Regions:
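Transmembrane helix exit motif
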Residues: 63-74, 95, 103, 111-135, ...
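Selective hydrophobic functional segments
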Residues: 52-105, 191-241
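Hydrophobic alpha-helical transmembrane segments in multi-pass integral membrane proteins
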Residues: 148-158, 194-202, 246-258
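Cytoplasmic-side transmembrane-helix entry/capping segments in multi-pass membrane proteins
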Residues: 77-86, 109-110, 133-139, 180-186, ...
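Selected transmembrane alpha-helices and immediately adjacent juxtamembrane segments
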Residues: 2-46, 131-180
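Residues within membrane-spanning alpha-helices of integral membrane proteins
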Residues: 12, 55, 110-114, 118, ...
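Membrane-interface alpha-helices at helix entry/exit sites of multi-pass transporters
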Residues: 45-54, 77-82, 173-184
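Residue-level signature of the transmembrane alpha-helical core
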Residues: 16, 20, 24, 55, ...
Length: 259
């Protein structure tokens, strides 16, 4: 029996609520997979379907959030063409490599790296006010940044939004709100590219993924608008809270062998 036919309406409702909350949080600070992946596993979905199904729903959310930032003129694709292209390439390569490469060493390093991102945003000197929109964005770092983070998202995924936000703040003269717009947009590119590989390999539960995707979209819409309206003062504490939760979750899972 297909998995979706064995899911009760109550379970489906719970997954929908989790997806909405995940979309809201992910649009602000990333880390939505921290909620949706365990929820799918708890619902009894076979592990080989969880990653692909989660990518499907995440793609809807990152598309909605990214487009919201774009419409508010907080993300300009023409300034980021190198990053967009290399992110897509990296995600495709990463998703393919994920089928053959043991990721145990990477998993054990993740909590430390993610926690480092949180510490940087907590103590680092990030811009407090919006910067000039016409400041040129250097192309020099876009290709390596895009390929590296796209590859990582294809291979693993947790913390990708945090990595995008912090690395963008470090490399370019933009504020936290615009860095969040870049992160959400690049997340969409890597999600969509990696999703193609999961679809080809038949690792997506379409019914569950589309239902959750719709709820993630709604959550992402409100989350992105909240982030833009609240600015850096709102994003910073939410981002740090999500990073700390993600650190605990990853450490528990990969250091202590707990699900």
């Amino acid at each position: 029996m297909p998995f979706e036919l064995s899911v009760s309406l109550t379970t489906l409702g719970i997954l929908a609520v989790v997806a909405f909350v995940a979309g809201f949080i992910d649009a602000i600070a990333g880390g939505g997979g921290l909620l949706t992946t365990p929820a799918l596993l708890t619902a009894g979905m076979p592990p080989h379907l969880v990653l692909g199904t989660n990518k499907l729903s995440s793609t809807f959310g990152s598309a909605t959030a990214g487009f919201t930032f774009y419409r508010r003129k907080l993300f300009h694709p023409r300034q980021w063409t190198h990053a967009l292209i290399c992110t897509a390439i990296g995600a495709l390569v990463g998703a393919v490599v994920a089928h053959y490469l043991p990721a145990e060493w990477l998993n054990k390093m993740l909590p430390v790296i993610v926690f480092g991102c949180g510490l940087y945003l907590l103590f680092g000197g990030t811009p407090k006010a919006p910067l000039d929109v016409d400041v040129p964005i250097r192309k020099k770092w876009q290709s390596p940044q895009g390929f590296t983070l796209g590859f990582y998202d294809g291979v693993a995924g947790p913390g990708t939004g945090a990595f995008w936000t912090v690395s963008t703040l470090l490399l370019y003269p933009i504020d936290l709100v615009k860095a969040s717009g870049v992160a959400r947009s690049m997340n969409f590119v890597s999600n969509a590219a990696a999703l193609m590989v999961f679809v080809i390999n038949g690792q997506v539960d379409w019914l569950i993924g589309l239902c959750m995707g719709a709820c993630v979209m709604i959550g992402a819409f409100f989350g992105a608008r909240t982030a833009i309206g609240g600015g850096a003062k709102f994003i910073r504490p939410v981002f740090i809270s999500v990073v700390l939760a993600l650190t605990v979750r990853l450490a528990w899972q990969h250091w202590f062998g707990q699900a």
